[in-house]
Amino acid sequence: MDAQPTDLEHAILKTVLWFSMFSQPVTVFEIWKWLVQPVRAYDLCEVQAILERSGWLQEKLELFQGHYALKGTVTVEHLLAARQDRFLDAERKFKRLRRAARFFRLLPGVRAVAAVNTLAWWGTGAESDIDLYVVTRAGQIWSSRFWLVLPFALLGARPQADHESQDPFCFSFFSTHETLQMEELCFPRDTYMAFWVKSLVPVFDRDGCFS
């Protein structure tokens, strides 16, 4: 009888499965960092050791240049090349975002701004928005949103339904600094929300909201 896979083997496979939804191969370090629903905390060396010796995982995963992905019709080599292209696109978008952050700082009601979604994962394409999460003072969400969005709308730097705008700024999420807890928005064992929160990339943070 074959031995049953361990908790760590299951967690590793779930992690690679999660990233496979975004066509993203992952390194040993990334698997360890983002390990999905393990029973206990594992050391990096434990993750690396079981990846090297587990026949159960080796039947399901493919390795290329230090990156793991599910075995299938698309090779890890192809996925890795696409990931590198997305990384370069995200790097360009982050440069534009950092320049825009100088304007964000002029608005006292805006307390913090972070990149989210595919930009936070360094996984954007040419058609992707610059998605942002904005934290404001209590009672100032709507006024802050107005003054924050207005110049980008006037400059044509917002997502447009009728034509494409390169690297448009999408102010996707707002909250106040008093309502940072998001438990009410979560499903039970909400893997997506856990990844979303953990992947935030602060652009600036006046009050340590993201610390």
What spans do the regions from the language model cover?
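Catalytic core of pol beta-like nucleotidyltransferases
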Residues: 2-112, 116-127, 136-211
